[in-house]
Structures are given as C-alpha cells and as structure tokens.
Amino acid sequence: MTNNQPSNACRKSVPSSSKHIKHLFRHTVSSSDRHDVQQYLLDSEAELCRYQAEVNRLKAKITVVETRMGGLKRKIRKYRTLLSPVYRLPSEIWAEVFLFFCEGESLIPLKTPAVMVVSRVCGRWRDIALSTPRIWSTISLRFEGWTKGNGGRLDRLQSLLVSFLQRSKNMPLTVNLNSLRVEKQDEIDGVVKTLEGLLNHSTRWQHLDCTHSLLALPAFQSLRNRLPELKSLYVESGMRDNSSSLFHDCPSLTSISISPDSWSDSDFPLHQMKTLSLRRSYAPAALAVLRSCTNAYQLEMHSIGGMSRPDTDHIILPKIRQLTITAENEEDAMTVFQFSTLQSLTSLEIRRSSVNSVDWNRWDLGPVKDFFLRSSCALTSLKIGSVPLSDEETIQLLLLMPTLTNLSIEEYPKHGKNKIVTDAFLQLLSSDEDELASSFLPSLNHLDLIVHLSSLHIPSLIHAIASRAPDDMGNISESSCGLRSVTLTVMAKEKPDMSPFFELQCFGDAGLRMNIFHKTIC
C-alpha cells in the first residue's frame, strides 16, 4: 500500500509560543519578548529547511518516476511497431526491395551509395544488406566526377570498390564503366590504379558496359582470357585498336551490343550469340558480323545502313525470332529486308530513331514484301513507330501477316494528323461479311494505337472494336477469339476532352481490357 503520509520531520509543529508572539502585535515588545521572537524565528527557519528538504526529496522521486515512465512510453512506441505489417515481411522480400531501390545507381562523389544508406537505417536492415551479396554485385562508375577537384576522391572510390567487392562475395558482377574523359596522364594513371582491384576480379564479371577508349588502356589487356563468366557486353563506339581481341575467348558470352565498324567478325565468338544489338554502322560491316550469328534468336539494328551493294551476299539466319529496327532513314530500314531471310521471325518492331529526323520521308515497301514472301515467317507481333507509311501501304503490308495477334501503331507526332489510322483503315479493320475485311488480321487479339485526336474518326474506331469483340466478353481468356485488349493513346497539343471516348469504356465494363490515355505533344 502506498504511503502518502509526510515524514516525521514535516510533522513537527511550529513552536507553541507562536500564540504569545502573535499577541505582541497589540503590545509593547519588551527585551524578553524580543528574545522569544528571535527563538521562534530560529525554530521556524529550521522547520522550513526540513520542509524544503522533504519537497526536494519528493521532487527527486517524481523526476525518477517520470523518467522511468518516459522510458517505458518510448519502449511501448518502439515495440508497438513490431506489430505493423512491415515487420511481417521476410528477409527475402526486403532483399528484393533493396535490389529494386539500388538498381541503376552509379558511384558518384559526395553521395553515399544507396546500398550503404539502406545498411545504416537499422540493425535488421544492415544484417539483411550484408547477408545479400546480390545488392553489392553491381558496380557502376562515372569517372568524370572522381578525377576532378579534390585529389582524395579516388582514394574514397577505391575504398568503395573494396567494400563492394568484399560484400558481393562470390556473386557474378555487373560492371558499368562510364567514358574516361580526363586530360592529364596522371589522372588516367590514378583511375587505372584505382580499378586494379576490380580488374583482378574479372573472372566474376558477368555483364560489362564500357567504352572503346577504356578498353584500349594497357591495364585492360589483362582481361584477355580472364572473362570466363562474361555473358553480355555493351561497348560504346570507337576506333579499331588492340582491344579488338579481348573478347575472342569468352565461353559464356551470348549477348553483345557493338558498333560493327569498330570490330571484325573474328573479334567475338559470334556462333555463341543468342541476342545481338548492332549500332550506328554501315551495312557491309554489320552484315559481316551477322553472317556468323547463326544461333542468335534476338536481333536489334540501330541506324544500320548505307554503303551496300546490289551484289551483297544474302544471309540466312534460321533462328531469329525477334527483330527490332531503329532507323534514321530508308536505307537503315531496308538493310535487313534486302539482304536476309528470317524464316523463324515472329516479332517485328520498326521505329524512327528520332521524331525530329527529317531524312526519312518515304519508304518503298517492295523489298519488305519480298522479304516476307521469301521468309514465309509466321509473324505474330508487329510494332510500327512513327514510320512514313500511308494507310494503303500499311494495309498492303498487314495483308502479308495473317497470323498477327499483336498490333501496335504509333503515328508520327510531327504530322499533326493520322496517316495510317484513317477512316479507311478502321473500316477495313472492322470484321464483317466483306471478303477482304474477313481476311484482314483474322487472328488479332491485342491492339495498341497512338494516334492524333484531331483526325481520329471515333465512330469507325468504335465499330472496329465492336465487330472484333468476343461473343462472351464477360469470360475472356487467352484462348478467346477476337480482341482481348485495346490500348488507345490520343495525342493533342493540350489536354483533350475525353468525353467522346466514354462510349469505348463500355467495352471495358463488359470484360474487354480497355485502356485510354492522352499524350501532350508540342
């Protein structure tokens, strides 16, 4: 039971003479009275000291109790967080979150890497970060910031590299090395010295992204025959030099992205390639590389064209299934169609490299039609982006693709009006009893249109979608015939009035996957 009674010191009464002293206010104070008053004051002050001591004792006790109470409240708040859903996440999920958070970040001066920020939040996060080598296995550098200003920056970079290499343990490494743009030789020497530790771990490199000028440095010659785990390689353009043979003996290399003008077909184990990306090169150099890639199934051609001759040898690539062409002009778009046969092709994407490009105003589809007749491929996916085609030309091209299930068309933003998705195109897209219409894309399941609002004939679009909708839209599956999904993006200079498209939304309510967006253009 709590004792709330005051201490003995506080229970002492004030001296009994206080009544006598009180009467002195009405009488003359004699010498003996003065002595009594002085004694009373001495006794009262002593009593007051005892009271103050008791108050201080109680205040101290209150302070102690309040301190303990505050500490308990903090613990309650802290421990209550353990009941929140985030603490039910297993460590494996947190590791995936950290991987996503740290993805694509470069090591730059004056900024703590995201993975280290994560590891300093709390003890559990630190344990997860240090026990997950994958989040330390991507090393991305931008040299410019490390070589300018404070000379101690390279020392910090070296320390960071040591931490990443140690904490990644034996995990395969993804190495991104930005262009080396330094003017002084001592700066180059400093960077190379800093990278020695990374080069010593080249046997763990799985993905490498670097520049041709960096590979030309003498220190990088040690990579020759020391890249057993390298699977993918991206090299920026550069002049052909002694770095060309660095990757000749890479038993795991299956994906490269290069400019063929900087290499020869003997610089890589091309027969191993599964995915291939060729960039900014004349056609002969690119075709020389392609000729040996007989096992590749994915091919990307970015600005590849020109300098080709009519007598150029024809190439047959029997396993290519996916082809992406990014073109600046008609020559770029024609290279593959003129000089190759791809009988296994199922997916094709063709787009203009830049909306500001003015070099591509027309496209002769003769070689393209010849390509499809020659290849006899069963194309199932086609993406057309900002290419100079009319509706009639596009229709003639699509008539060669009866197996097409996915169609994506993006109009050229600079035209201001639709050249492909016209009223005539939409009327033909409508599936009805007309013989030509019934043979036009009979297997189409997914339609994606990016069009100008100003010249879009909405009633024809609604009719086309309605005519191709499955009979049972409420039960659409992957085996359903007809359209399963439609994505429409309308381009306009200002945010458009979307009310005319409300009628389209009824298809979404009925079960068709219907998405409508707008895109502001200049």
PLM feature spans:
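Leucine-rich repeat
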Residues: 1-522
